[in-house]
Amino acid sequence: MFARIALLSAPYSTLTYALPDIFPEEFWQEGLRVAIPLGRGALRAGILMERLEHSDLPDGVTCKEVAWPLETVPLLSEEIRALARDLAIRQGLEPGCVLGHVLPQGLRQVDLRIRWLAADRDFSCTVKQVTKLE
């Protein structure tokens, strides 16, 4: 399963990502805010604009996976996403650019912490720290 994700910060592109199998398919709803990897480990916030059964990428090209959902329910309704798409077409912009200028700063950023629980220790860190560990 794949998804078209609109980035909420520059470069504001709409990109295709694979949806991880650790969540059931019905969990990934359009309008959900997600954290996606961009470049060398940097995480960006994006909105799941549409789900796809198949990727439109050429053969041999692999998709990165969505890193993590940032909410459990969709942030944006279909009406708001349609409005953003229409405004983007009229202004010659990407939908993520429109949404990125409308949503509050806190929703355009990723502040994600990962916590590992092991039998011998409890370890907590931010995603930025995890990428430095690898």
For each predicted feature, which ranges?
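Accessory, non-ATPase domains that flank or precede helicase/AAA+ motor cores in DNA-metabolism machines
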Residues: 1-134
